[in-house]
């Protein structure tokens, strides 16, 4: 796992000094603390800090197209010879790469048979030779998580690619003379004259989803390369293309786990279980390839317990597992994690922390680059900090919910669909104002609150209904917040299009499957995977996700929804397939989630900061929000008339982010203090 950054150009005005790319890589040093190097096309070789510059700041002259590739390395595989940027045999193709290619050993013999000569044992070099052999189609051969940039010195072009699910991030900006790119936005901001104009469209999207979705960026003119896309920069033009999609529109695969064709595409439930066990076991085994210590996150939920259990079965000694706990019972899963660890026989590490929002906020804001208000980033940061003390690589259960119907909202989607088919007169009663008479609750996940939300949205189309369930601020609330001037800047932009486009991917499937597909294309890469990547890389920890192996994802996408979702809940096939790895209490427990007590914080330790942040004259002077609307949200939350904790967190994060990234003339230095004192339990 590493960090990448660089610049490419196509005109004589484009060449850049080494020092610019060194600055771009230095600001993401946390992603790769073990080594740093750059490649400069003017001399066609790799440089370290000790080498004289290829082009000094006062002498940036070079004819024709070129590139500088930067790399920060976290050593995982081939510790001795895997330095990057790395080249092919004749040094005509250079790569800077972030991620892991798990099937690199399987790919190598065929490439060697085709005449390619390997100089290292790294997975990185496999990509270089695949590109030589297949060009942009090289991505179709890769099994792993990745973003990379390849400079093709013969064709004078830059090739960028991102993995299928979107586990690794890639930002880029195109201007008249340059294409700049990097693993994090802060790297691009090191480029001289990098603009920082706030995008009104991105703010509107952020307040809808709690993140800024691809391909948008919080600053105008910057973009995120979408998952399963590659980009080609040549002759000053940038072409992007999609190379993969989850096959929700297809039926059961016509091949088995051994690669041979099956006689029929109509599988029995037992056949599905057999294929699932084989495919997920293979995904776990591939992700255990490492030349450094590895372990697993273990929350005591179904997904992380299955991953930990498979790792333990594949290991000759107890694996390391890690869980984090909190003093507040409703947010603490350590008892389940402890039970799972004892059941599986792992070497378990458990810590209880008392999170202090005031101390963690600066670190969150600096690392996340863009506004990002999923509060589970807080415990994910704590867990990553604790895990990195023991191992360099951790496997996680991320993706199990989206692939196998783990969220309660998928059940709600199914219930709402059945209610949609009721006679019109019954729906008329359910959609009438009678639902407003149900006593309310300020608890985010109370059954009364869920029933009210379900009935309130029955009259809408399924896609719009789902958006109302998952958004932070709906259209009406956002428009009530915005000042006249900012509303005009947002204009007619429709934040729902991002989700609706994802729903359109598989129109012929049942609506629960369509919803899972939409989440895999939107919420999973933009929220869950972004959260985990940033939090883990803040501590130079590599996180691997077996459920997000594209072979597992393809199998799950084709699977009939009734195998995943039953009347009692989701993940039915996971529980039945891996029953031997799951303690009975974990098979039947309710999903807890990974959260913090935001509502209490905003009535306690965070209230002064909340008011100072949102109602400060300098904040209001930005002209984005109406002061009276902000005050109303705070008052309603204070008086427990409504739980606005997620909305207030989103607004506070946005303002503090602007103070960090918009107001200063340069991106700030990273906070150096630890998150908080951590109480050791076991």
What name fits each language-model region?
Residues 1-4, 42, 52, 57, ...:
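Adenosyl-5′-phosphate
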Residues 1-368, 380, 384, 579-580, ...:
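Cysteine-centered catalytic environments shared across enzyme families
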Residues 83, 164, 176, 382-442, ...:
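Active-site adenylate/phosphate-handling loop in enzymes that bind or generate adenylated species
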Residues 127, 383, 436-454:
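Glycine-rich phosphate-binding/catalytic subdomain of phosphoryl-transfer
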Residues 328, 352, 371-374, 421, ...:
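Alpha-helix capping and helix-loop boundary segments enriched in small/acidic/polar residues
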Residues 343-346, 369-375, 439-445:
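A polyampholytic, Gly/Pro-enriched intrinsically disordered region
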Residues 365-367, 408-415, 668-669:
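Short secondary-structure boundary/capping segments
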